[in-house]
Amino acid sequence: MSDWKIRFGTAGTSDSFAAQGYKSSLDVPEYTAKMGLNAFEYQCGRGVRLGLDKAAKMAALAGPKDILFSVHAPYYISMSSLEEDKRLNSIQYLLQSAAVCRALGGRRIIFHSGSCGKQSREAALEKALDTMRRAVEALDEAGFADMTLCPETMGKIGQLGTLDEVLALCAVDRRITPCIDFGHLNARTLGGIRSKEDYAAILDRMAEKLGDQRAERFHVHFSRIEYSAGGEKRHWTFAETQFGPEPVSYTHLRAHETVL
């Protein structure tokens, strides 16, 4: 029998973490459990700075509470860069993230693929696909074959990260799983996700491209995001209600591992 199940958690901590008297990353498991959550996406957006020993201690504290960690890799990953050095560095950032993720007892590494820059979307995607293939090879060679890379859908139109672009990256290897950020997709489509039918179309597209079993285990982000003509402008709080998760909550989500 599969041990997969739907999980809910936060990406990083909010102001409530300090307000409740927590000070250390070692407090994250207790903080998460008190909210009734069972997942936590550790943020390495500004660099992988969490030591492996501390990560292992966090994993030991999280295990009895059935909390599963994932890791968001550095924001400056650019798998589509015109500069080869930046593409190669991106692979190193994924390797660093994989090491921390394993120490945390997790398996999923979420990352932004990069931007199109001064090249066509097609050219940017080809570079990202090549970098992804090399990243998978590097992870395998480094002993991280059990890690799951999760390219994320992005909110700015100039970024690489439409639903189809992310699914193309996932086609590189069966171990790659999409991170579907519904807020980002809504922003880059200028408010194109309004109903449960819109959400269902996204889920159906994933199933079509990945097959039901892979599509059932995708990683999810949800946030309210303000957008302009270029897509994402800024993140909102959940107190701002122009775009919310209600339609997707009524859709039959076929996921077995979720971060909302």
Where do the language-model regions lie?
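Active-site beta-loop-alpha junctions enriched in small/polar residues
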Residues: A11-D15, G45-G47, P74-Y76, G114-C116, ...
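Aromatic-lined glycan-binding groove of carbohydrate-active enzymes
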Residues: D198-G230
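Active-site acidic/histidine proton-transfer and metal-coordination neighborhood
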Residues: S80-I180, A187
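Single conserved hydrophobic/aromatic residue that forms the stacking wall/gate
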Residues: H252-L260
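A contiguous pocket-lining binding segment that forms or flanks enzyme active sites
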Residues: N186-D198, I202
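Hydrophobic faces of well-ordered beta-strands that scaffold small-molecule active sites
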Residues: I6-G12, F40-Y42, F69-V71, I109-F111, ...
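Short, electropositive alpha-helical surface patch
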Residues: M58-K65, R121-R133, D164-C170, G231-S249
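N-terminal pre-domain/capping segments
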Residues: M1-A99
